[in-house]
Amino acid sequence: MVSSVSLFASLTPYLVSALLLFLLLEQLFYRLKKRNLPGPLFVFPIIGNVVALIRDPTSFWDKQSAMADTSVGLSVNYLIGKFIIYIKDAELSNKVFSNIRPDAFQLVGHPFGKKLFGDHSLIFMFGENHKSVRRQVAPNFTRKPLSAYSSLQQIVILRHLRQWEESFSSGSRPVSMRQLIRELNLETSQTVFVGPYLDKEVKNTIRDDYNVFNPGTMALPIDLPGFTFGEARRAVSRLVNTMSLCVRKSKEKMAAGENPTCLVDFWTHSIVAESPPPPHSKDEEISCVLVDFLFASQDASTSSLLWAVVLLESEPEVLRRVREDVARFWSPESKESITADQLAEMKYIRAVAREVLRYRPPASMVPHVAVSDFRLTESYTIPKGTIVFPSLFDASFQGFTEPDRFDPDRFSETRQEDEVFKRNFLTFGIGSHQCVGQRYALNHLVLFIAMFSSMFDFKRVRSDGCDEIVHIPTMSPKDGCTVFLSSRLVTSP
């Protein structure tokens, strides 16, 4: 015992020296990578500024954006051993998106996403593997499948709107729209992706596991039982297993010659027709991509639908024109579905939807990792291993006419600012990893705007800071969009 204490005492100076050397080198390497870019002069050892990020994400990223104004559109920081660069300038963001390749950048979607989502996630693929999966996925978002999805989307949306009408349309008490819309989106995603293979128990399992997973995207990356991140990672594994069962049932159904009725059916229908099956078409591999879709559609759509309600309530003239556009094709009393052709003809509502996505892009940033040193500007080379955060939000307020104004007409056929400033409209990304489901997402937003605005009058409950942005994990209004709802229908549809 005495010898152990003596040994420890003799080693203590060396251990302390090694620790001090490590801390000194950590600061030195940070300063060397930082060079003359704006950012903290010194960072907290090991964890960096992750506590500030977890405590108040909005404030953290606002400060990074403000610092980037003082340079070439870049600022830096340090998070749990990772040097990060925030990219505010739209052209530099385009440069990152256009260089996803083995010797430049890899999309990570989340600073610790690979550990959270798993190796088979489409997010982390590039090269031939990524092209192979995209070739399988892309046909599932063409006109015929989208038309089938639209019918399913409307059934779910209308069912939830009727429930809201029964519960809240008296207008006697306000309701926070966030949870209502979140539940609507989760059921819509489940129904469109794997609907025929879900019973009530499986739906509840997916909902519960997703609710465990979601907080993990905003937690410290401690992968241990009882910690939010660790529980989230295990929830992803359970979601993949659940989706794998649906994929297997779909393959059996398509092999029997039945017609596809949901996304996984359209996908497996083409797979069973090939012999041998294409690469990356195993049950687990397909289910991993379906979980990616679930994450993308759930939180991103919740954000966009919430902001649609917020912005329509604050813009009465826009809301009036939306209702006029809907009335040309559809009425809740008609008990008819909106057809694919009618959906395409709702041009003003589509402009409103696109402006919602520009004004408040659901994912404010899309993290990438530098696979090797990359010369971003004439004066700065991004070091290998750096996590870069191109800001879609900041890009949306560059170039456009009066960018701080909510103006759907900028997307009209006359002005076409989406084409004129397409390098600034990055909500769905660009390049090889551009969102494959963007037409589906836009249709979902258009359908919700059309149906919700036709069925309800809504009045926002104003409070201090209600319009402030919070990241949970996508951008949402701070108050969850609290409104009074009242039915516009004489009788229930």
Swiss-Prot record:
Reaction catalysis annotation: 5-dehydroepisterol + NADPH + O2 + H(+) = ergosta-5,7,22,24(28)-tetraen-3beta-ol + NADP(+) + 2 H2O
Localization (cell): Membrane
Tissue spec: Expressed in stems. Detected in primary root caps and immature petals.
GO biological process per UniProt: sterol biosynthetic process
PROSITE patterns linked: CYTOCHROME_P450 (PS00086)
Broad class of enzyme this protein falls into: oxidoreductase
Pfam families according to UniProt: p450
Membrane topology: Single-pass membrane protein
Cofactor: heme
TM regions (residue ranges): 5-25
Enzyme Commission number(s) of this protein: 1.14.19.41
Gene Ontology molecular function, alphabetical: C-22 sterol desaturase (NADPH) activity; heme binding; iron ion binding; monooxygenase activity
Record protein name field: Cytochrome P450 710A3
Domain of life, per lineage: Eukaryota
InterPro entries: Cyt_P450, Cyt_P450_CS, Cyt_P450_E_grp-I, Cyt_P450_sf
Main location: membrane
Lineage: Eukaryota, Viridiplantae, Streptophyta, Embryophyta, Tracheophyta
Protein keywords: Heme, Iron, Lipid biosynthesis, Lipid metabolism, Membrane, Metal-binding, Monooxygenase, NADP, Oxidoreductase, Steroid biosynthesis, Steroid metabolism, Sterol biosynthesis, Sterol metabolism, Transmembrane, Transmembrane helix
Family: Belongs to the cytochrome P450 family.
Gene Ontology cellular-component terms listed: membrane
UniProt binding sites for heme: 435
